[in-house]
């Protein structure tokens, strides 16, 4: 079996550790813990790291297409490796959830998230696993764009780092168990 673990975000230095990049932050954390290095792949428009875990090949992916075109990279990788959407797990930010909250789902709509909209459009399905990480709503007077492209304040950053530990554990549990239903029961909240 092969798994494709995709963290969503925007490429480039100015987006590092912005709220919209929590998916990248999580995939970076997992790969750092596993001592994996990313390779830029221009054909797939993604940074990719891979390893074998429990006898399964696992690809960790950060699309370099910018958020709104993430589906291009995901679709290309699924097609190239002959993977089914059952093998896909996407991690991304959710501004409708409180900072640091996580929600695991086996399917669902885009919920207004442009990266997820792009994936749904390109793979033709909403039936893929996802982990949403709460980044909270914008404060009064702050636009959604400025909010999601902004950095976390000190307290929220500490919360997010703790959340990334929890999501890292959830992803590892899923990769070890192979059972996303069990993972949802254990880690939702």
Swiss-Prot record:
The gene is pth. Belongs to the PTH family. TRNA binds at residues 15, 66, 68, 114. Keywords: Cytoplasm, Hydrolase, RNA-binding, tRNA-binding. InterPro entries: Pept_tRNA_hydro, Pept_tRNA_hydro_CS, Pept_tRNA_hydro_sf. This is Peptidyl-tRNA hydrolase. The record marks 93 as: Stabilizes the basic form of H active site to accept a proton. The active site is at residue 20. GO terms for cellular component: cytoplasm. GO terms for molecular function: peptidyl-tRNA hydrolase activity; tRNA binding. Hydrolyzes ribosome-free peptidyl-tRNAs (with 1 or more amino acids incorporated), which drop off the ribosome during protein synthesis, or as a result of ribosome stalling. Catalyzes the release of premature peptidyl moieties from peptidyl-tRNA molecules trapped in stalled 50S ribosomal subunits, and thus maintains levels of free tRNAs and 50S ribosomes. The record marks 10 as: Discriminates between blocked and unblocked aminoacyl-tRNA. It holds the Pfam family Pept_tRNA_hydro. Monomer. It is found in: Cytoplasm.
């Amino acid at each position: 079996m092969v798994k494709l673990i995709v963290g969503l975000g925007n490429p480039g230095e100015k987006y590092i550790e912005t709220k919209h990049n929590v998916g990248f932050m999580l995939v970076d954390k997992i790969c750092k813990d596993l001592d994996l290095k990313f390779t830029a792949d221009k054909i797939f428009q993604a940074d990719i790291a891979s390893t074998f875990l429990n006898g399964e090949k696992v690809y960790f992916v950060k699309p370099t297409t910018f958020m709104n075109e993430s589906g291009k990279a995901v679709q290309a990788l699924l097609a190239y490796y002959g993977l089914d959407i059952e093998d896909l797990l996407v991690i991304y930010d959710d501004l409708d959830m409180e900072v640091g909250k996580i929600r695991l789902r086996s399917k669902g709509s885009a919920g207004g998230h442009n990266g997820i909209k792009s994936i749904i459009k390109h793979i033709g399905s909403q039936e893929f696993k996802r982990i949403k990480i709460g980044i909270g709503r914008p404060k009064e007077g702050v636009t959604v764009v400025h909010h999601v492209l902004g950095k976390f304040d000190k307290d929220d950053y500490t919360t997010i780092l703790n959340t990334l530990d929890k999501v890292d554990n959830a992803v590892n549990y899923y990769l070890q168990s192979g059972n996303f239903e069990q993972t949802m029961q254990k880690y939702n909240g």
